[in-house]
Amino acid sequence: VSAEDPTTSTLAIDCGGGGIKATVLDDAGTMRAQPVRVPTPYPLTTKLFIKTLVDLSKKLPQATHATVGLPGMIRHGVVVATPHYVTVRGPRTRIDPALVEQWNGFDARTALRDALGIPVIVLNDAEVHGAGVIAGKGLELVLTLGTGLGCALFDGGHLAPHLEVSQAPVRWGLSYDTYIGEHERRRLGDSLWS
């Protein structure tokens, strides 16, 4: 983007437990490119995560900044905890303590800003999705269903502190992710799920 062209564009990346999707949006929120998707690679080190997102960005038009949604608890672009990326082979597999140590406290915003060379915002994935659908009036709760359950709360259009409910227990030994996530949808089938 040249100095004479005030157009801004956003590299929008949705990082899920099963896939990582990206596209570029103009300042009105309209897609400027067809979305691209890759399966989430496991085991997913922070280094492989950054490489995967950079590789995806190279398949899309250049953007002036990026917004990245990650599963889990994210504070100021830093990963507090993530449920899927700390597992050996993805959701519902064994947790790797070395990955937990690597991800917890990982400054994703700074790492992505340095790798992409543009300003980056990193939020919880449900918060990013919610920002695109809320009316901006009153108290709004956004729930997303994907690999697991995502949750975002907005008050008067402002994002409230994140409440991570995906790993909360529903029944003895069952989290919300396990109870109503993608694995359960596949088990029940679309006709029962709807």
How does the language model describe each region?
Residues 138-141, 148-170:
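Anionic-ligand binding region
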Residues 6-8, 117-118, 136-140, 147-149:
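Short coil/turn connectors at secondary-structure junctions
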